[in-house]
Amino acid sequence: MKAPVRVAVTGAAGQIGYALLFRIASGEMLGKDQPVILQLLELPVDKAQAALKGVMMELEDCAFPLLAGMVGTDDAEVAFKDADIALLVGARPRGPGMERKDLLLENAKIFTAQGAALNKVASRDVKVLVVGNPANTNAYIAMKSAPDLKPENFTAMLRLDHNRALSQLSAKLGKPVGGMEKLVVWGNHSPTMYPDYRFATADGASIADAINDQEWNANTFIPTVGKRGAAIIEARGSSSAASAANAAIDHVRDWVLGSNGKWVTMGVPSDGSYGIPEGVIFGFAVTTENGKYTLVKDLPVDDFSQKYIDKTLAELEEERSGVAHLLG
């Protein structure tokens, strides 16, 4: 049996956490031969800690052969101690009447503290995925608060947007998602992200050629993917939790185990490619191998795409400037 991997999860008793933990413990994220130790963080309030205890009881009752241990805590330094993987799910949700800038600042406090705790106690090779919104900027804040860790190990989740885009293309073409490759979602995990199927194929054939309808792309496809989260809240009465958890598992599984040459979308610190300023955490197409990701370089960007990329970058720059004073 392999040595256990320590997986820290914040917001562990929340909706996404509840949809996530059982799948991690069953081996869906890291493989059916990889034991895990779950290190679970929740807020230091009685209700959250009680809920966390209940989730841990359920995890025990599943008798997962791969679950080698569990810790439940309200202390980030306990949760992140020697963590190999950290899933930062917990974030302050936007309350009624709350301005976006207030939400940014509230989350900046959380992710500054969590970045500092990771910097202090996590494995030096910890892989960090930020799920809690605004995910790209929260990941940027955590990265900047952890100067001793590798910047490239801080990532934001755009896989949900990627998967949503795949499902829309599947419905349009009447083809299964399994045969689709080379989709990319550029930018911020927000309604400004740009799902781009110019290079994508279905069973080896060009999706752009098959659809051949730029009006559908601009007026139906892009807005549908961008507003899908809001549509789910409207239909379900609460936000997309199971699909977000699924995307987190996809993101980490591909990062750790490799994408076998397939493109996947990850929010990663820019190296200056595609005119995105260095360090901005931005959705790019990547391939993954041996626990590392590599940007897909030199893709042509047409005028239509550039307009969308500029728009999502402008939003990220605005978010970044809104928290700059907190990062020194």
UniProtKB/Swiss-Prot annotation:
Q: Top-down, what is the taxonomic lineage of the species of origin?
A: Bacteria, Pseudomonadati, Pseudomonadota, Gammaproteobacteria, Lysobacterales
UniProt binding sites for substrate: R94, R100, N133, R164
Q: Which residues form the active site?
A: H189 (proton acceptor)
Q: Which GO terms describe its biological process?
A: malate metabolic process; tricarboxylic acid cycle
Offer an example of a GO molecular function term for this protein.
L-malate dehydrogenase (NAD+) activity
Which Pfam families did the record assign?
Ldh_1_C, Ldh_1_N
Q: Which family does it belong to?
A: Belongs to the LDH/MDH superfamily. MDH type 2 family.
**Stated name of the protein:** Malate dehydrogenase
The record, for HAMAP family, names: Malate_dehydrog_2 (MF_01517)
Coiled-coil boundaries: none
Q: Which cysteines in this chain are paired by disulphide bridges?
A: none
Q: What class of enzyme is it?
A: oxidoreductase
User: What does this protein do, in the record's words?
Assistant: Catalyzes the reversible oxidation of malate to oxaloacetate.
Q: Matching InterPro entries, A to Z?
A: L-lactate/malate_DH (IPR001557), Lactate/malate_DH_C (IPR022383), Lactate/malate_DH_N (IPR001236), Lactate_DH/Glyco_Ohase_4_C (IPR015955), Malate_DH_type2 (IPR010945), NAD(P)-bd_dom_sf (IPR036291)
- E.C. number, please? 1.1.1.37
Where, by residue number, does NAD(+) bind? Answer: G11, A12, A13, G14, Q15, I16, G17, N107, Q114, V131, G132, N133
Q: Which keywords accompany this UniProt record? A: NAD, Oxidoreductase, Tricarboxylic acid cycle
Reactions this protein catalyses: (S)-malate + NAD(+) = oxaloacetate + NADH + H(+)
Q: Which domain of life is it from?
A: Bacteria
